[in-house]
Amino acid sequence: MPQSRTHSRTATKHIFVSGGVASSLGKGLTASSLGQLLTARGMRVTMQKLDPYLNVDPGTMNPFQHGEVFVTEDGAETDLDVGHYERFLDRDLSGQANVTTGQVYSTVIAKERRGEYLGDTVQVIPHITDEIKSRILAMSGPDLQGHRPDVVITEIGGTVGDIESQPFLEAARQVRHDVGRDNVFFLHVSLVPYLAPSGELKTKPTQHSVAALRNIGIQPDALILRCDREVPPALKNKIALMCDVDVDGCISTPDAPSIYDIPKVLHSEGLDAYVVRQLGLPFRDVDWTVWGNLLERVHQPRETVRIALVGKYVDLPDAYLSVTEALRAGGFANRSKVEISWVPSDACETEAGAQAALGDVDGVLIPGGFGIRGIEGKLGAIRYARHRKTPLLGLCLGLQCVVIEAARSVGLDDANSAEFEPETTHPVISTMADQEDVIAGEADLGGTMRLGAYPAVLAKGSVVARAYGSEEVSERHRHRYEVNNAYRDRIAKSGLRFSGTSPDGHLVEFVEYPADQHPFFVATQAHPELKSRPTRPHPLFAAFVDAALRHKLEERLPVDVHGEERAAADDEIAESADRDEVASVDSAG
């Protein structure tokens, strides 16, 4: 007879989050919020996303299909949910946090070619599922600081019933068998639709979703009941009975006013306490000090500021998810609500178009992107912000567009990027040397950009150095093109200052117009939005929103000859910022 296994109750616990009925129910936010609650109870939590698509990573996927690509410190291109994980846990994750079917199959096929399966017939079970399990269990190993997590939360992408998700669900089922049932918790997110004609909430879709999960061999321990309203106790009892789940494990999650309210919603329903009891974790009260301060700033802003996001993919806001969350966090730092005006970059190609799109905003943000479409509109928005003294922040492609606009302003009329016009006579933005084979089609496109965290040195006394409070910083990157150093001196005649470079001085990382020329005009080749946290806003975004507030208040309170109204504006800004209450941000953001 096979020997029975013994499992330690002190082992790392695994929580699997699956979804049913429909996609886009908020599995990622649910998982992130539960992670935040467990972290607030004093536990060390890490998270992982299993994506069932065949792409190796989302790096080459259309932003309109996938949304943004979130880059980790170690340079992995990952799903946007990993950004939620980092923001809610307030910790950096690695490339291990995102596993795709493409990665799994690539690894298994490579092992087969090397003969590692000793002549076995390679199959989905056990070879694919074993590879998935190894990646799940690897998350319970020590992190860079040598600490093992108390809890690993793994979100399984897709919907129960999808063909693509079946190997991942089977692997999760096997993990429960391998590490012990007491060490695994299955949380299933399901839709409870409301039918307006009959005025009823319907439980049948959830029942069918759980039945499909059971057919795979997984009995959920708790259910997240997604609805646009509270699920009444009678329906909770019915769902608990029909799905064989404790009533305490049936969690009603109506739509919340803010994503940062979701931890409070889950806590009020008792989910975190239920998980702690079921897994035998140490029971500590939730420390709401940090998150409660955040919610106060979310719901009690003292000012409102309007920021134009001038982008190419504005029809799908998820394409700029980290940017919008970083803007909102910059607002939290200044006790302000940030309203985002989504501006298609094409709308700003003409001066009249830029005036119509940007005339009523307090700041302009130029985000990253690829390709020539909409570039002239971005240049028009930059020109408008420069002439009108409207605060501007450029990110990645935003820096490249700022440099092109500055070059054209000093007589290099056909200045352009080698990306948009390879034959331009003035390639002020050029292809990085190690990217030329990729551009020529002689190397892989995916996973070959300049990716991950890189250091930069900032000029003493510069706007960016003052914003960071340091002259040495580190930011994450994702690009193939750089400022052409042959044009630095000529571009500098426009007044644009190259205020931050790589430590060797070769790569331009930050540009700006000095404070005596413009109230705030900064651009970076990096993606600082990826390091922003709601509880620790990134200093560049905090400074940008602060400048936008000043711009707004100066419009409201014009300067008189004695400067009295300027002083009044400064007092109002100082009160609204209230920076002493914001957690300090280190030089790395």
Swiss-Prot record:
Positions with a binding annotation for L-glutamine: 369, 397-400, 419, 480
For this protein, the record's Pfam families field holds:
CTP_synth_N, GATase
Q: Where does CTP bind?
A: 23, 162-164, 202-207, 238
Q: Where does UTP bind?
A: 23, 202-207, 238
What's a BP term from Gene Ontology annotated to this protein? 'de novo' CTP biosynthetic process
Q: SUPFAM superfamilies, from UniProt?
A: Class I glutamine amidotransferase-like (SSF52317), P-loop containing nucleoside triphosphate hydrolases (SSF52540)
Report the InterPro entries cross-referenced here: Class_I_gatase-like, CTP_synthase, CTP_synthase_N, GATASE, GATase1_CTP_Synthase, P-loop_NTPase
What does the record give as the reaction this protein catalyses?
Answer: UTP + L-glutamine + ATP + H2O = CTP + L-glutamate + ADP + phosphate + 2 H(+); L-glutamine + H2O = L-glutamate + NH4(+); UTP + NH4(+) + ATP = CTP + ADP + phosphate + 2 H(+)
Instruction: Name the enzyme's class.
Output: ligase
Q: Name one GO cellular component term.
A: cytosol
Q: How is its activity regulated?
A: Allosterically activated by GTP, when glutamine is the substrate; GTP has no effect on the reaction when ammonia is the substrate. The allosteric effector GTP functions by stabilizing the protein conformation that binds the tetrahedral intermediate(s) formed during glutamine hydrolysis. Inhibited by the product CTP, via allosteric rather than competitive inhibition.
Q: What is its EC number?
A: 6.3.4.2
Q: What range(s) does the Glutamine amidotransferase type-1 domain occupy?
A: 306-554
Pathway involvement of the protein, from the record: Pyrimidine metabolism; CTP biosynthesis via de novo pathway; CTP from UDP: step 2/2
Q: How does it assemble?
A: Homotetramer.
Q: What does this protein do?
A: Catalyzes the ATP-dependent amination of UTP to CTP with either L-glutamine or ammonia as the source of nitrogen. Regulates intracellular CTP levels through interactions with the four ribonucleotide triphosphates.
Family annotation (HAMAP family): PyrG
Task: Look up the further comments and give them.
Answer: CTPSs have evolved a hybrid strategy for distinguishing between UTP and CTP. The overlapping regions of the product feedback inhibitory and substrate sites recognize a common feature in both compounds, the triphosphate moiety. To differentiate isosteric substrate and product pyrimidine rings, an additional pocket far from the expected kinase/ligase catalytic site, specifically recognizes the cytosine and ribose portions of the product inhibitor.
Q: Give the protein name, as stated in the record.
A: CTP synthase
Organism equals: Rhodococcus opacus (strain B4)
